[in-house]
């Protein structure tokens, strides 16, 4: 379980006299439960990636608290990270290594014994339908193949919590469907707590047990798709989202996320 309480983060844009402070995240709160998929839904620049980077201990919040299975991310970052699988940017693969070697390398980083890591690679290959990829070098992989390898790396230490930042970006229809089915299995068969950010309505409707709508750096609504639609009285979920996020069509103010450091999640762990 991941709990986020009153999370805030500012960034300074520009230099000298042109410098200004932009509030990227402003009091975001939500709880992501075990055995459920929680979608962080918002327009570009809403603060989704910044929020997930703070959850993954890649950014320090200015205010607020994050706990992962009861562990305070600020006070116990290494212990919390050990209980998270973060889907790093697929460009972070080591292209001279095979998919298997990439996954096993991350197993060693997480301290997974070799006798445990080997069978886990095989099990993940079956679950993600990537067995033909295992012994190929990742250079030249398609976006979907890279995504599967990155997801396997994120899961190799069997974390109870999984974080994905817009995981279907750049994927074709078949790769998107494959990823969606994998996430369902992780939820239904293994009881994982899964958080993913997106701005795609269909992903939310098909996957999410809970939706957290973020706009202008704030949590503006949360609940199931049915509950959010009932709240607005609108049958179409896209219209529901527009009503909740923009008040029926108001333009969002510029956010730091689209102009500064919080690029897609990436780094030295997954």
Please provide the spans of the model-predicted regions:
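Catalytic Walker B motif of ABC-type/P-loop ATPase nucleotide-binding domains
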Residues: 162-166
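Conserved ABC ATPase "signature" region
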Residues: 104, 108, 115-133
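Helical segment within the ABC ATPase nucleotide-binding domain
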Residues: 177-190
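ABC ATPase "signature
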Residues: 222-223
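Conserved ABC transporter NBD signature motif
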Residues: 64-75, 79-80
């Amino acid at each position: 379980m991941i709990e986020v309480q009153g999370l805030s983060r500012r960034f300074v844009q520009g230099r000298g006299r042109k410098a200004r402070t932009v509030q990227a995240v402003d009091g975001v709160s939500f709880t992501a439960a075990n055995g459920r998929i929680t979608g962080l839904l918002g327009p570009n620049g809403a603060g989704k990636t910044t929020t997930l980077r703070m959850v993954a201990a890649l950014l320090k919040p200015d205010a607020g608290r994050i706990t992962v299975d009861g562990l305070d991310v600020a006070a116990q970052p290494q212990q919390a990270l050990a209980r998270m699988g973060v889907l790093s940017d697929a460009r972070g693969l080591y292209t001279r290594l095979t998919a298997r070697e990439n996954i096993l390398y991350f197993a060693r980083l997480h301290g997974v014994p070799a006798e445990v890591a080997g069978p886990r690679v095989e099990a993940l290959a079956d679950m993600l339908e990537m067995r033909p990829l295992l012994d190929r070098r990742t250079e030249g992989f398609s976006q979907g193949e890279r995504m599967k390898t990155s997801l396997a790396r994120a899961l190799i230490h069997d974390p109870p919590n999984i974080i994905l930042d817009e995981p279907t970006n750049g994927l074709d229809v078949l790769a998107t469907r494959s990823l969606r089915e994998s996430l369902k299995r992780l939820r239904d068969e293994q009881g994982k707590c899964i958080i993913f950010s997106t701005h795609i309505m269909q992903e939310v409707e098909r996957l999410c047990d809970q939706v957290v709508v973020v706009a202008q750096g704030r949590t503006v609504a949360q609940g199931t798709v049915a509950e959010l639609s009932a709240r607005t009285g609108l049958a179409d979920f896209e219209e529901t989202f527009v009503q909740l996020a923009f008040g029926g069509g108001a333009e969002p103010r510029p956010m730091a996320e689209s102009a500064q450091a919080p690029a897609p999640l990436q780094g030295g762990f997954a």
